[in-house]
């Protein structure tokens, strides 16, 4: 075979079909609220901002580590560094085709996680090896293996467009989210796409998102999965818009903050007036 260059950039991957046979966009999301075109027509000022972020690993001190012990009664006990022992238990049962009641997962003292230990890696392997050998099996990743085989957060390309009136009321907000998922579909795009403008009271919103596969490790959660990357683009645009109309960025945010019962995409919004005590 002939080695080819990997497709690691989210924007490059969107335009190619080399990772998967059909296309590299695994999922497309579009969420609407109100009339986005009318909202921008009513705006006196419009700001657009584009940002790119790189994949970032959670950087926990303790690597993934598991001990599995298969007993003659057909049960398996797994001691592991995890943030989700019930999920791990269910996945081990599914992969090993065992009854859920035959598996016990004991979460050990966690040496850091930040979302990165929500995913199953070593546990089914240790459990299967223990079942085959009929002896306890311990597996620990090296730091190199952690970086190569576990999931970082998505690399992203995010675009935000926001318009407001002269008195500082946001009339429309639009965002495009392009999130790397790694070699397999399934990034934190859905959470990011449904919460991108959740902090604000905006009548006209359009959010378009793409889950893009590329030649990287499958991504995992990392501290408010998906939110920081799009927040970087949106909040930068908010700052620029506030400066453009001569309003303090904090006052601008408070003026447009979500209130009790504010309607937003898919979910009822948080109340900034209550949360901030204003």
Predicted regions and their residues:
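Positively charged, low-complexity/disordered segments
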Residues: 1-16, 270-273, 277-278
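Structural alpha/beta core scaffold segments of enzyme domains
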Residues: 8, 14-269
